[in-house]
Amino acid sequence: KGAAHSLARLFDVAADPANRALMTFPSPKTGATVWRCYQVPKTVDDLALRRLMSARWAEETFGLMGRTPDHVAGFLAGYAAKPSVFAEHGKEFARNVLAYHEFARDHHLYLSYAIVPPQIDRSKPAHRQSDPTLYAGVVKETDAGIVLKGAQQLATGAAFCDAVFISCIHPMQPGDEAY
């Protein structure tokens, strides 16, 4: 209950017209007002405003609430700032990163992430586990998207967010491509 009220306060701060210049910016695609945490900084001023926006939300919770909506949004903004990293494995990966950043930004998504595999046998990479579906991984690709099977944890904020971004904090090894 307390976390839900704290998040509601953050959304209220972002929606308050008095905070518009700090907390939001116009979507490059639609011109609609969107959260600044999704902005890809192009200037020193953009970066400074992004920091001030995060500081404003941190002040609202006295710095005690982890994984506020700006956290994973910042990851997506970082990915969108450098899509060439994703293009190294295929142009479609860069396009997908940019499209998802745009979608999340323009729909004000509060995202959480799940980034740590279950605590099983950490001496083995994902593809060498006794059951290939212990770690979250792609088991099927369709025109509509991917089908995942398995688990991933450390999804702080998942109970409140719009979607969970599945990723992995551990370095991947050859053979782990599905994970």
Kindly give the residue locations of the regions a language model identified.
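Internal helix-loop-helix
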Residues: 15-111
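Generic recognition of long tandem-repeat/solenoid scaffolds
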Residues: 146-149
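Beta-sandwich/jelly-roll carbohydrate-recognition scaffolds of carbohydrate-active enzymes
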Residues: 100, 121-138
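A short core secondary-structure module
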Residues: 151, 155-179
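A short, Trp-centered hydrophobic/proline-enriched beta-strand micro-motif
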Residues: 108-121
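Short, surface-exposed, low-complexity cationic segments
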Residues: 2-16, 159-169
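Short alpha-helical segments and helix-capping/turn motifs at coil-helix boundaries
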Residues: 95-99, 131-133, 151, 168-170
